[in-house]
Amino acid sequence: MDKKVVLITGGSSGIGKSIGTYLTQKGFVVYGTTRNPENYPDFKEFELVQLDVKDVESIQRAVSYVISKESRLDVLINNAGVGITGPIEETPHEEILHVFDTNFHGPVHVMKAVLPQMRQQGSGAIINITSIAGYMGLPFRGFYSATKGALGLITEALRMETKDFGVTITNVAPGDFATNI
């Protein structure tokens, strides 16, 4: 059987890097994404490709690159994200847009980019990394909670939309982790 091909957004550090390293050790073909792969010249765990979840064209390029190299894509792990803290009334509009573009709109665009390939294959899995914060409005983290809650709901809707195509979609909602976000 061919090795499963995995694409992990935010794969250069934190949870994404740990997942990618583990899957590589288990025999998966892993591609991790980062906005600036040139910042990781010594990264050897798996191949890093350029992808900014806030840039739809870079998403298309990265997904096309993986598919052109592997002729398939079996698993997407939507992991890239940013944190934001502060009182809602004092959070600048630009920061609100940034957290929604990164934590919600970006993963949606990545899912839209991989779904045609998965549908064509008749199989695939999408795992969205949400957060326990998406199940409750945490004080001083309201916008972060909102983005993760929205991603959880779109995951639920898309799971029902794609169930007849052989594509499974779920989310994983970790608690606090010491990462660089």
Residue ranges and their predicted role:
Residues S12, G16, G20:
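N-terminal Rossmann NAD(P)H-binding glycine-rich loop of SDR-like oxidoreductase domains
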Residues L51-R61, H93-E94:
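The beta1-alpha1 cofactor-binding region of Rossmann-like NAD(H)/NADP(H)-dependent oxidoreductases
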Residues E89, M136-G142:
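Active-site loop immediately N-terminal to the catalytic Tyr-X3-Lys motif
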Residues M111, T147-A150:
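Active-site helix of classical SDR
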Residues S131:
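Residue(s) in the substrate-gating loop at a strand-loop-helix junction
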